[in-house]
Amino acid sequence: MSSMRTHYCGLVTEQLIGQEVALTGWVQRRRDHGGVIFIDLRDREGLVQVVCDPDRPEMFKAAEEIRNEFCIRITGKVRPRPAGTENANLTSGKIEVLCHELTVLNPSVTPPFQLDDDNLSETTRLTHRVLDLRRPQMQYNLRLRYKVAMEVRKYLDAQGFIDIETPMLGKSTPEGARDYLVPSRVNPGHFFALPQSPQIFKQMLMVSGFDRYYQITKCFRDEDLRADRQPEFTQIDCETSFLTEQEIRDLFEDMMRTVFKNAIDVDLDAKFPVMEFREAMARFGSDKPDLRVKLEFTELTEVMKDVDFKVFSGPANSDNGRVVGLRVPGGGAISRGEIDAYTQFVAIYGAKGLAWIKVNEVAKGRDGLQSPIVKNLHDAAIAEILKRTGAQDGDIIFFGADKAKIVNDAIGALRLKVGHSEFGKSTGLFEDTWKPLWVIDFPMFEYDEEDARWVAMHHPFTSPKDEHLQYLETDPGKCIAKAYDMVLNGWEMGGGSVRIYREDVQSKVFRALKINDEEARAKFGYLLDALQYGAPPHGGLAFGLDRIVTMMAGADSIRDVIAFPKTQRAQDLLTQAPSTVDEKQLRELHIRLRAQEPKTTA
């Protein structure tokens, strides 16, 4: 294998009994047992037990001095472990290595934590990331990430895709998330932007005739971070020419099935279900529904229009209001304390409260219900609620009534909270499996109340459905896009669309977004020009590599599948980035910092 070692520690098995081996690695733990020293030696493949006998005084003296995380090399003979001392949890658990020679390659200061401590704070882990990455789970996560990327490349290469790099330094187009800006030293007052995606470049590669493109690349967005977001993230970016929307979806659905099978031996559905955006929002309040949770919304807006209860009738009679019920089978067993906790939970999403009805006996109608709101509802409304929700004895119905967005967010989050709870799992409301689906037919635009204009729901290069082209100039809100998202267990794995490939249509979309011809030419003139040279029909999508690996690894955060991630404050605790820079560097970039204005208190 090399002059320093013959095998990886974790790969020494009973097949090597009787053989001499040379091993290198780190001391996981050292134990003294009755004059014999045992060392758990670790490398990236796992652990092996090394036995140091005092019969070899020089070696034994070295073994007495080693401590956790010392980097060492040993030579010795593989032998079976004594009966009753085998460790079934280790690949090397049936053997041990009797040490002949031991060399300390490099000692270690006392580590700030034990590598097998499962209760470390994330701050500690990220500050000492070099040590954190030695932990078996992190080694597994990053090797899984490599395997997923390799499987993606193998699949796309076999399908005739070409890996082409696109620029990291590009032009700022302030649509969507904030750009990370890079000042140009040689062009004073001018800035590059780090790419939020290679979107326009990959479209131009289709115009250039490359037909099938991909790259696994870094993208950058200066936005507020959550558990599934990073300022820099890795995208599996793909684009194709001369394929229909259905053909694009079929191709990448097959890719994802292949990658899951080869990377973690999981068989995803032979055919992913397809759901329109409108249906997903109606049933689940989300465009990325977690289908493992067997709870759905019941639409009650019409039912509540004439009730004498403003909490329900107000939103029901509002243009952008919505009233829904969420029936939880067996939820009558949920305690008042748990209901209060759920009420506080939905408040995070803007809900002003959480109305509920416990169904004790359906047959008794009003008299069989338990809730402070029942007195505010007339008999016809109660009957319709029970009928539409399909309520049974022992159920609870939660209600959301507010602006549609608040209802969707709050009750959608409550649906997941209940489904993933111990109650949900123990009562069959949660199915522990893989549930992929496509969400299609997104609105082309959504209305921005603050700016009083239409904005692109995905991006302004998404094609509207052919029969909706007429609405671009008359009623943009009616436009449905040829857009699609692949969703898995409530996470958006990837998303894309068929693109606009005609310059006249692209210009109409810009105008619908209140981007006039002059502004469009200044920002996107190079794309508009390219589309005039016989641009082919094309489309594609991009997958989030970080998210895919996070799901496969069962990790809590994408920070657990990235070697050196940023915190939720976009900081690297290991290197202390971002940092201040020298005044000289700022002068070279023609930049002067303004002092921050002091915060005033009322």
Curated annotation (Swiss-Prot):
The keyword Protein transport does not apply. ATP binds at R221, D222, E223, Q230, E492, G544, L545, D546, R547. It catalyses: tRNA(Asx) + L-aspartate + ATP = L-aspartyl-tRNA(Asx) + AMP + diphosphate. L-aspartate binds at E175, R221, H458, R499. It comes from the Bacteria. Its EC number is 6.1.1.23. Residues 199-202 are annotated as: Aspartate. The record marks H33, G84 as: Important for tRNA non-discrimination. GO terms for biological process: aspartyl-tRNA aminoacylation. One of its GO terms (cellular component) is cytoplasm. It is found in: Cytoplasm. One of its GO terms (molecular function) is nucleic acid binding. Keywords: Aminoacyl-tRNA synthetase, ATP-binding, Cytoplasm, Ligase, Nucleotide-binding, Protein biosynthesis. It holds the Pfam family tRNA-synt_2. Belongs to the class-II aminoacyl-tRNA synthetase family. Type 1 subfamily. NCBIfam families: aspS_bact, PRK00476.1. Homodimer. Aspartyl-tRNA synthetase with relaxed tRNA specificity since it is able to aspartylate not only its cognate tRNA(Asp) but also tRNA(Asn). Reaction proceeds in two steps: L-aspartate is first activated by ATP to form Asp-AMP and then transferred to the acceptor end of tRNA(Asp/Asn). This is Aspartate--tRNA(Asp/Asn) ligase.
